[in-house]
């Protein structure tokens, strides 16, 4: 539904990684709205998982042309899957993780921060982590979901470098990839904080793309507005 506002239909295959980021972002309001009425428990995970499987099944004919891209993502995820089990973690397991588990056990409680300020939520991305905080090694999923987002952002920026006709844009996004790899290579230090930082940097690149590239201006503005809500 959203992709039609942000991409030309014939150009969607060049932005599959970015569309996955849109899915990550849309998980946030979906989880927040649900959390008004229910905790984000394993039932939420299983229901959304079944919906996703059903969507893939009904659109399976369209996925045959995406085999190469899907295979590439599967390989990347398999390579980094051990991080879920061997990563040691740090203070995030005492700072971010308790908030994530709070979302798994309770619906939104208005005014709870007046009882204990540590229960206030300044970062909505905790809701995204709460969606994936299940199954074996659940506490390490705090980092696994962050790493999936991290990989998708790097692949998205690479797509922009590959498809851009502007040298200025290629230079900026190349520098941005190096910055992200150097700055955020230890995701344990950032927990649920780095997603907003990366989106701000990425959106700045979209602003530059608006002025220096020949892409559809309206679609770029729509992307900027969309990502603005998830800083």
Which residue stretches match the model-derived regions?
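Membrane-embedded, hydrophobic transmembrane alpha-helices
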Residues: 1-64
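Transmembrane-helix signature of polytopic, membrane-embedded enzymes
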Residues: 11-19, 157-181
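Membrane-interface alpha helices of multi-pass inner-membrane proteins
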Residues: 30-35, 184, 220-231
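Membrane-interface helix caps and helix-loop-helix hairpins in membrane proteins
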Residues: 32-40, 86-89, 183-192
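Transmembrane signal-anchor helices characteristic of membrane glycosylation enzymes that use polyprenol
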Residues: 55-56, 67-91, 179-181
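Active-site lumenal/periplasmic loops and adjacent helix-entry segments of GT-C-fold
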Residues: 80-169, 187-189
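Multi-pass, polyprenyl lipid-linked donor-dependent membrane glycosyltransferases
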Residues: 145-149, 173-175, 182-209
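Membrane-interface transmembrane helices that cradle and orient dolichyl/undecaprenyl
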Residues: 163-165, 203-221
């Amino acid at each position: 539904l959203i992709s039609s506002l942000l991409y030309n239909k014939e150009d969607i295959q060049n932005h599959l990684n970015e569309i996955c980021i849109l899915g990550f972002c849309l998980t946030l309001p979906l989880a927040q709205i649900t959390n008004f009425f229910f905790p984000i428990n394993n039932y939420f995970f299983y229901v959304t998982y079944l919906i996703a499987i059903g969507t893939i099944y009904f659109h399976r004919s369209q996925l045959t042309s995406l085999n190469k891209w899907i295979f590439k993502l599967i390989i990347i995820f398999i390579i980094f899957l051990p991080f879920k089990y061997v990563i040691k973690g740090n203070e995030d397991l005492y700072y971010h993780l308790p908030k994530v588990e709070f979302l798994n056990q309770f619906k939104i409680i208005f005014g709870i921060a007046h009882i204990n300020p540590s229960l206030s939520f300044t970062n909505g991305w905790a809701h995204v982590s709460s969606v994936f905080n299940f199954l074996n090694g659940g506490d390490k999923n705090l980092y696994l979901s962050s790493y999936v987002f991290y990989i998708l952002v790097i692949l998205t920026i690479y797509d922009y470098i590959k498809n851009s006709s502007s040298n200025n844009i290629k230079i900026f996004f190349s520098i941005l990839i190096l910055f992200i790899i150097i700055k955020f290579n230890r995701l344990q230090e950032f927990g649920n904080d780095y997603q907003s930082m990366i989106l701000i940097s990425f959106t700045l690149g979209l602003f530059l793309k608006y002025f220096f590239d020949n892409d559809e201006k309206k679609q770029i503005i729509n992307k900027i507005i969309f990502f603005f809500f998830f800083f």
